[in-house]
């Protein structure tokens, strides 16, 4: 659909589970982009899956037709056998192809298997690669093949490909000789809150626990974390916050591994005030991943002023810079030693806390992400609706 420079864009987004949702990083990204674009006056439609929250129907929220100016449409979804992502993206792509859209934005590699269809109907198609999903351990042979097929469709048909890390950018250049655009995720400044619900529900107090927050999937390195933590001499608890994502057996394995250790707590999926309290009162935040796209949970943890310890994969180490610590990916011994060091040296963690929030909010800003994305859509005369204000971010953390 042609559009004049001063007209709003009609945008469709697909590939996520639901919006609004915190079921994964993709859902957070789609929520931030779509609502901010709608605030700018663009017409945005998000195609949501039908069915239940991946961590259980107890986390289902109200079914909405509109959220903060964004239209929400639900598409047919097959819930069985890991087919939800594939079937929902197929039907979303069909609707987007026949809809009156200027731009169709595909999120994640698998959904890009249908990118050719709206392209065939003259839509401008953008793909965001949130990570090299075919490498994830949870997928079987067919799923991995299909995701890789989606990756190749993005390479062949997408007008622009957005990547979230320079490591993935290098992968596309070396594998396909395809140019991509590096647009890392953003983060919003956060206000710390007191421990209240987490004390009542889990007996947790400020600075008395080590926090992992994310999906319970094999590539997050949770096996290493539990094994390493068991060897650390500390009174601090280990809190593993997050739900499964088609990985119920893996979640069961983790809980069996932690059985008998009263200091390890599994909270399940968390959101809202509970999430804010966990971030605000952790002693350190740990992300031991083998594979990441760009970990939003790490950005969020730093925005709350946490001292962070991550694996040394580029997707994590590039984010924390000099404002955190890393261990050798997959090394239980190195992870154990770094955990022990941080538990024994509160002055070191406090020093990192003082700098992490200001650093991360100054470096990664959602308004910048929106403006860069709109430029890739072909929007003209873009004005940042909420300019990046470093001074404001700095003030938010004075005295915290």
Name every feature range the model reports, one short phrase each.
Residues 50-52, 187, 213, 237-252, ...:
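Glycosyltransferase donor-sugar binding loop
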Residues 307-310:
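Short hydrophobic beta-strand element within catalytic cores of glycosyltransferases
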Residues 94-97, 120, 144-161:
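Membrane-proximal helix-turn-helix segments that form the acceptor-binding/catalytic region
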Residues 325-333, 341-347:
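Conserved acidic donor-binding segment of nucleotide-sugar-dependent glycosyltransferases
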Residues 290:
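Aromatic "clamp/platform" in nucleotide-sugar-dependent glycosyltransferases that forms part
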